[in-house]
Amino acid sequence: MPSHDKQMGGLLLLCGLTLSAATPTYHVLGDEPGAWPKILSSIGLQPIAGGPAGVVVVRRGSPQTAASWRSRIDQGLILVLEGESDLAQSFGFKPGAKRIAVSSLKDVRAPKLSIVWEQALEMPVYELPPQARVFTAERWEGAPLVAGYKQGKGAVLWVAVNPGTEGYERFPYLLHALNDLGMAVPFRSSKLWAFFDSSYRLRVDVDYFAKRWRESGVAALQVAAWHFYDGDAEQIEYLKRLISACHKESILVYAWLELPHVSEGFWRAHPEWREKTAVLDDAQLDWRKLVNLTNRAAFTEASKGVRTLIESFDWDGVNLAELYFESLEGMANPARFTPMNDDIRAEFKRLQGVDPLTLFVSPAPPEKVRAFLDYRASLARRQQGEWLDVLESIRRKKPYLDLAITQIDDRFDTRVHDLLGADASLTLPLLEQHDFTYLIEDPATIWNLGPKRYPEIAAKYKPLTPRQSKLAIDINVVERYQDVYPTKQQTGTELFQLVSVAARAFPRVALYFEKSILSPDLPLLASAAAAVTKIEQNGAITVIDSPSGVGIPWTGAALLDGHTWPVRDSGTLWIPAGRHSVEPGGADPAMRIEQFNGVVKSAVWTGRAIELTYESTARVFCRLSKAATALEIDGETIAAGLGVQIVLPRGQHVVSLR
């Protein structure tokens, strides 16, 4: 097995000689695969050492003739040619005499996107075969850098130079080009979370966007709820339409809270409760207008408003996000440092005998500075506990509500404890009293680091809680302030690598935010989020091992572990977590589950009914291929004459659908 296949050996094993279209594979000729395994595996393609591969990368040259390659291409192979070689020339990609310096690129998918290399390269201007389509070119002279064409059932893709050490430093959209040329993707996930801010989507067709989110693998939307805390009639109607559109697509909708920012109206109405910075200005920092929630009157009024907000709309959950203190500059910038309201100053002075405001006057006693920073972190934990109690009281009226806490990571970048007052070791023990997802937010300080940080972050949380299934990771897809290349914002292969690695390190991946994900990335996003640890192929039988469940391209009836499997939409067979065998066969069920936002543990078509076992931290929207006539939950008849979409309770349940 070549060296790169050995490196991937821990992730998967392919066996058998027959490879179906549902399991696209790749092979890189030679012993130096470069970054191609990182690129191709980021959307689920599987490496194979021998036998027919769907994608073959030739980096330098090939002992096989161009004629033999053309024959394989006609039969369905996608051949990738890297740089200058005799083989590339035989396919019409020929270097010319003119040479140019390349540093800025233009891609057909995002012509206005700035794609810049960290170091310019001098290279020839290539002549292309007449049938080739240019995907990426040098921005100013238009010299082709990535091009390809379809031939028979297959295709040829040519890149002018290697894609870089990590696979995304030069050409962010190589996978998109391969997809355009007919490369199939093997797996899909439907478990992503995404954050949503209506101020960026005021005039959109919410039904259209809900379908698009579902197709991109989004299972839940975290909606900026502060806009609706004291919203007008138009805002209220918008939110109702948004929630309804998402529910029709079996997408959950969470109220995303950003306390201590309550709302614009709350800030204007209560200047007496505004948080203060360490220079005693009102704490209006970036877009957030912070409120002193330590003040009992302010807390009572804000909690009353939050209760009304949650009870007035058909939310599926609540996300208590970023409930700690500014700023990422910590005490080095008093103008952004919080909290410094009168209540906090008085409380800390009672505890430590010093007004914390004096700690910003040099020289400050180091032990008092340390005491205040630790007090600040414990205060954040205290407020989280208070607000969880509020949400639990609301959940007694709405027992289907799911809960989440989003908190910036302080384990990988340990400075965060002192900068923001966030401490996972204080917050995670709350899981002993409350059921919630703990969503770890990527700190801005490490946005420039690669995807390998996610397994490292996950490892740092293992000692903190035995409830590893409650951990999730939030990837910030935004423009980064660091010097990064080739794009300021993660897109293409870089984004897919981040999502792919994160999905293997954590049970749940969230993206901030849906508006920032560039349109070219949406069709492949669900594939990047699909985690598969092992796949075996033996004739018509495919064995798949997935930690979280996965969808595979499929049409027609299927047997899962030898039994008729009823969880399938028009193009995807949805396989539960664990190790399972799949093969065509059996009678097509008269009724199928097409969408299901819970965790399917087992499902059987009996010939008359679907017998289903599932679990979910939120209520479940289950869309069927035809209307159900009867529903039983845990042996109790619930209803008859149901439609094609039914709502099931949170928790663990056994369901019969007829």
Spans of model-derived segments:
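An acidic, glycine-rich "communication" segment
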Residues: 84-147, 151
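Substrate-binding cleft of secreted/luminal carbohydrate-active enzymes
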Residues: 431-531, 536
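Substrate-binding cleft/loops of secretory-pathway carbohydrate-active enzymes
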Residues: 327-328, 384-455, 484-488, 498-501
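A glycine-centered loop/beta-turn motif at secondary-structure junctions
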Residues: 24, 38, 42, 77, ...
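Active-site-adjacent "subsite" loops/lids of carbohydrate-active enzymes
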Residues: 200, 252-313, 356-373
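Catalytic domains of carbohydrate-active enzymes, especially glycoside hydrolases
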Residues: 43-48, 203-229, 312-313, 429-439, ...
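Non-catalytic C-terminal accessory domains or segments of carbohydrate-active enzymes
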Residues: 35, 81, 162, 174-177, ...
